[in-house]
């Protein structure tokens, strides 16, 4: 008789033991980075300046010297549409994670009710003043709850968590890309503005040269070939001015599209390209660990961990589930 009871209790003990275990997901192992462990040596790898700083230790505000560019980047981080969408995706992933995490715990509900009624004397058995019966009731229960014996719910919760973290890293990647694009467009606009001024000065000089040759031609000193060559130079310079004028307009439109709103004139670059492109001096040697800190790499690894957790949920689906 005792032996029969032992075998009857064995499945229950086994189920409780499984409930205390982890999940059926495989052990996650971080992939090895395909980079060299040491910094290469040779003539091409010169020593850095003593004042050079490591880029990994600097925030984006510390990289640029131009104050207008810094203010423009802050405006872009506030107004850019893609960055807003990335932030909304984070809120969505956070909500999904909270919903998935709630499945780990039972939902308990409680309800109470009271009723008091006064009866007249002719209906209360002749009691003076009537009767006042009272009724009270209370119910406590919980919604359907799955006993997570094989870690299916925990695996799904881990998957939702990793996807939420991957979304956060994707937002960081979008932010870094936005900073790089705005800085590049800013420098491109400054470069084209400098080229436009150079083209305008060249056109003015070519016109002056043409006028001089034209007077010489009228006096019979210069030949018609000299006059035509001077006229050709003027037309080439005029075409350069038109080309760079169009390029400046396109650069400004692209920059405003990145920022997300009209850019104030005081934040636009001038023709001083050297001042606009000034940056702090950075060290050339960057440790390979920086690759693991890149948001796009972090996001990819989080998605890999989410897929790893989903394997545990798929394995647990082969076993029976108990729902209370």
Residue ranges and their predicted role:
Residues 3-9, 16-78, 157, 161, ...:
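Terminal intrinsically disordered/low-complexity segments used for targeting and assembly
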Residues 17, 143, 185:
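Conserved Rossmann-like nucleotide-binding pocket used by diverse enzymes
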């Amino acid at each position: 008789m005792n032996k029969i009871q032992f075998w009857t209790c064995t499945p229950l003990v086994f189920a409780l033991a499984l409930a205390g275990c982890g999940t059926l997901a495989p052990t996650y192992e971080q992939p090895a980075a395909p980079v060299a462990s040491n910094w290469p040596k040779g003539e091409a790898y010169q020593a850095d300046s003593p004042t050079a700083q490591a880029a990994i230790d600097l925030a984006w505000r510390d990289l640029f010297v131009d104050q207008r560019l810094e203010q423009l980047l802050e405006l872009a981080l506030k107004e850019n549409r893609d960055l807003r969408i990335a932030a909304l995706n984070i809120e969505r992933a956070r909500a999904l994670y909270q919903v998935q995490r709630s499945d780990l715990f039972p939902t308990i509900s409680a309800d109470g009710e009271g009723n008091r009624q006064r009866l007249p004397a002719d209906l209360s058995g002749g009691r003076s003043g009537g009767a006042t019966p009272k009724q009270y009731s209370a119910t406590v229960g919980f919604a359907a709850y799955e006993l997570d014996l094989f870690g299916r719910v925990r695996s799904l919760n881990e998957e939702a968590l990793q996807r939420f973290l991957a979304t956060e890293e994707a937002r960081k990647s979008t932010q870094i890309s936005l900073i790089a694009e705005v800085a590049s467009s800013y420098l491109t606009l400054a470069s084209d503005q400098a080229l436009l001024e150079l083209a305008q000065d060249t056109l003015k000089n070519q016109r002056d040269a043409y006028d001089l040759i034209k007077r010489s031609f009228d006096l019979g000193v210069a030949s018609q070939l000299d006059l035509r060559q001077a006229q050709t130079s003027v037309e080439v310079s005029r075409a350069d001015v038109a080309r760079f004028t169009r390029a400046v307009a396109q650069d400004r439109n692209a920059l405003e599209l990145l920022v997300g709103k009209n850019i104030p004139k005081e934040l636009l670059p001038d023709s001083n390209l050297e001042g606009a492109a000034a940056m702090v001096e950075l060290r050339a040697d960057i440790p390979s660990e920086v690759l693991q800190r890149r948001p796009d790499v972090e996001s990819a690894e989080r998605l890999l961990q989410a897929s790893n957790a989903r394997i545990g949920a798929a394995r647990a689906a082969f076993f029976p589930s108990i729902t209370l």
